[in-house]
Regions:
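Positively charged, solvent-exposed patches that mediate nucleic-acid binding
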Residues: 1-123
Length: 123
């Protein structure tokens, strides 16, 4: 994306996560990314992370969220759009996925969602 790097904040409220759950999403490898455009004019990006009990116990879920947070920290400044809320959801294999492949999963999902937003919708 071009322009200034957007400010990145965290999603913290359940209602924000539920709003993103109704938004378009894409799955790639070990993650799912949901993206919801906000109605406000704030030029910031908000992101939240989810790892369910299917991933494992609390230790595994926290490790999965740490890996997703680092991937988001590395990629969102370059591959996100201002005014969008993202939720990154861990899938099976997120803990064992090699780091370069996990980064590629997140990057590809972000690019797919950006392409879907840019494509004209017919019908």
């Amino acid at each position: 994306m071009t322009g200034a790097v957007p400010t990145i904040q965290r999603l913290t409220k359940r209602s924000e996560f539920l709003a993103c759950a109704r938004a378009p999403s894409t799955a790639k490898g070990a993650i799912v990314v949901q993206a919801r455009p906000r109605d406000d004019d704030a030029a910031l990006v908000r992101v939240g992370f989810t790892a369910t009990k299917r991933i494992g116990g609390a230790v595994e879920r926290n490790r999965a969220k740490r890996r997703m947070r680092e991937a988001a920290r590395a990629l969102l400044p370059n591959f996100s759009a201002p005014g969008i809320d993202y939720v990154i959801i861990a899938r099976g294999g997120v803990l064992t996925r090699p780091w370069p492949r996990l980064l590629d999963d997140v990057k590809t999902a972000l690019l797919r969602l950006a392409a879907d937003r840019a494509a004209p919708h017919i019908g």
